[in-house]
């Protein structure tokens, strides 16, 4: 064990990729999951679209650099958490490893993450890229939800560490509610919610646009994103919140100042109702999406009710938040309150239906917030990949050569670090 280089942990999300070395508390880099390529596409030449000849093949950029290249086509290879374009993903990983981590892939084990309900074929593609193109000595593909549970251990005593819980993972492109029992995801009960960070940004953009506050149109999206990240919070009661702003606006309304990218002049806007209306679409999705009207607390309740009866109480007791879109102030508190109401109402109803003969035992609902929420998945990966067990459960290059990519279909659960 001694003298071995730390494993590389890479968590690829729809919006951002988090990368760094195991054992660290935070990722070294957080970059947008996009890649800028030169497209040579003429009409009808699909095959030649991006495989340029010779040295042009290296002419691409990823992350923040990719966004700044106007003469290149910017692509996002991951949609709703799942890789859609494997050619681009391979190029993306190439720069992640060599340019950002500056690692020699043959010397480091790798921990990559996968979304819930990822297909076994996708794991095989990942294994092929890592073992064939980068020649890594070992690879482990971890489920994001399990890592998020592990990350929540920072907020509890060692005796209470458990890999049973409900993970609410809300990123840029998709929100999942994932029940996990003893480190295994209960796949049949996963629900996904079509509302995530990007939808909140769009919704705030729309609110600002309706008010016509003088934002340059080409900057309206980044302004909405900045407003969301700086000023938004979750309120306990919509009507009261509106009243607060109407009676004492100066105390609540914030000023956002931006610089017009073209004229370089400053512009400033007032940020009012947007502050609490943005994140409110988690609890009232119909504000932004008329096709989906189920609040997040009801989705969580339904997920847990679908699970086997003997794990329901532990699932209510350990609801873990993960991902950037759960970072709004009081998000956890509001979710806990709404969920508690739903659960208590059900218990009360069952008591009434039994004519008072049944006294149900109250259910403990706990939503756990911790300071690692935003990079919970990466941090969980960093913790697990720095334990000695990690190297025993990794799939090695030798196994891969003997058996083939199918070994990566199954990755054993490990590390209830008791």
Swiss-Prot record:
Role according to the record: ATP-binding component of the Arp2/3 complex, a multiprotein complex that mediates actin polymerization upon stimulation by nucleation-promoting factor (NPF). The Arp2/3 complex mediates the formation of branched actin networks in the cytoplasm, providing the force for cell motility. Seems to contact the pointed end of the daughter actin filament. In podocytes, required for the formation of lamellipodia downstream of AVIL and PLCE1 regulation.
Assigned keywords, A-Z: Acetylation, Actin-binding, ATP-binding, Cell projection, Cilium biogenesis/degradation, Cytoplasm, Cytoskeleton, Nucleotide-binding, Nucleus
Subunit structure: Component of the Arp2/3 complex composed of ACTR2/ARP2, ACTR3/ARP3, ARPC1B/p41-ARC, ARPC2/p34-ARC, ARPC3/p21-ARC, ARPC4/p20-ARC and ARPC5/p16-ARC. Interacts with WHDC1. Interacts weakly with MEFV. Interacts with AVIL.
InterPro entries: Actin, Actin/actin-like_CS, ATPase_NBD
Location of the protein in the cell: Cytoplasm, Cytoskeleton; Cell projection; Nucleus
N-acetylalanine sites (modified residues): 2
Name the record gives this protein: Actin-related protein 3
GO molecular function ontology, one term from the record: ATP binding
Membrane-spanning parts: none
Alphabetical GO biological process terms: Arp2/3 complex-mediated actin nucleation; cilium assembly; positive regulation of lamellipodium assembly; positive regulation of transcription by RNA polymerase II
Family: Belongs to the actin family. ARP3 subfamily.
Keyword Hydrolase belongs to the record: no
N6-acetyllysine: modified positions: 240, 244, 251, 254
A cellular-component GO term for this protein: cytosol
Pfam families on file: Actin
Annotated SMART domains: ACTIN
Keyword Membrane assigned: no
């Amino acid at each position: 064990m001694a003298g071995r280089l730390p494993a590389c942990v890479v968590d690829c999300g729809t919006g951002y990729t988090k990368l760094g070395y195991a054992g660290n508390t935070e990722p070294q880099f957080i970059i947008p999951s996009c890649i800028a390529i030169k497209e040579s596409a003429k009409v009808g030449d699909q095959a030649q679209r991006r495989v340029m000849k010779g040295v042009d093949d290296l002419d691409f950029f990823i992350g923040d650099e990719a966004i700044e290249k106007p003469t290149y086509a910017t692509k996002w290879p991951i949609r709703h958490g799942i890789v859609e374009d494997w050619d681009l993903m391979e190029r993306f990983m190439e720069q992640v490893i060599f340019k950002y981590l500056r690692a020699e892939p043959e010397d480091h084990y790798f921990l990559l993450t996968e979304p819930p309900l990822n297909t076994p074929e996708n794991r095989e593609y990942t294994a092929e890229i890592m073992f064939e193109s980068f020649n890594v000595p070992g690879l482990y593909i971890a489920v994001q939800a399990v890592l998020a549970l592990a990350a929540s251990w920072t907020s509890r005593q060692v005796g209470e560490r458990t890999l049973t819980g409900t993970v609410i993972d809300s990123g840029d492109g998709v929100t999942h509610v994932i029940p996990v029992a003893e480190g295994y995801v209960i796949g049949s009960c996963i629900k996904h919610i079509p509302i995530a960070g990007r939808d909140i940004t769009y919704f705030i953009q729309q609110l600002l646009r309706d008010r016509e506050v003088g934002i340059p149109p080409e900057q309206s999206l980044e302004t909405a994103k900045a407003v969301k990240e700086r000023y938004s919070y979750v309120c306990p009661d919509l009507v009261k919140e509106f009243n607060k702003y109407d009676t004492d606006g100066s105390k609540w309304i914030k000023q956002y100042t931006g610089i017009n990218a073209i004229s370089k002049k400053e512009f400033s806007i007032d940020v009012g109702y947007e502050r609490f209306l943005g994140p409110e679409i988690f609890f009232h999705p119909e504000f932004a999406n008329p096709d989906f009207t189920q609040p997040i607390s009801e989705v969580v309740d339904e997920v847990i009710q679908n699970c086997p009866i003997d794990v329901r109480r532990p699932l209510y007791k350990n609801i873990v938040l993960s991902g950037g879109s759960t970072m709004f102030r009081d998000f956890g508190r509001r979710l806990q309150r709404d969920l508690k109401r739903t659960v208590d109402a059900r218990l009360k109803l069952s008591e009434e239906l039994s004519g008072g003969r049944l006294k149900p035992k109250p259910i403990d609902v706990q939503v756990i917030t911790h300071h690692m929420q935003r990079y919970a998945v990466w941090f969980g990966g960093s913790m697990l990949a720095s334990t000695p067990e990690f190297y025993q459960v990794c799939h090695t290059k030798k196994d891969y050569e003997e058996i083939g990519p199918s070994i990566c279909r199954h990755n054993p659960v490990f590390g209830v670090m008791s």
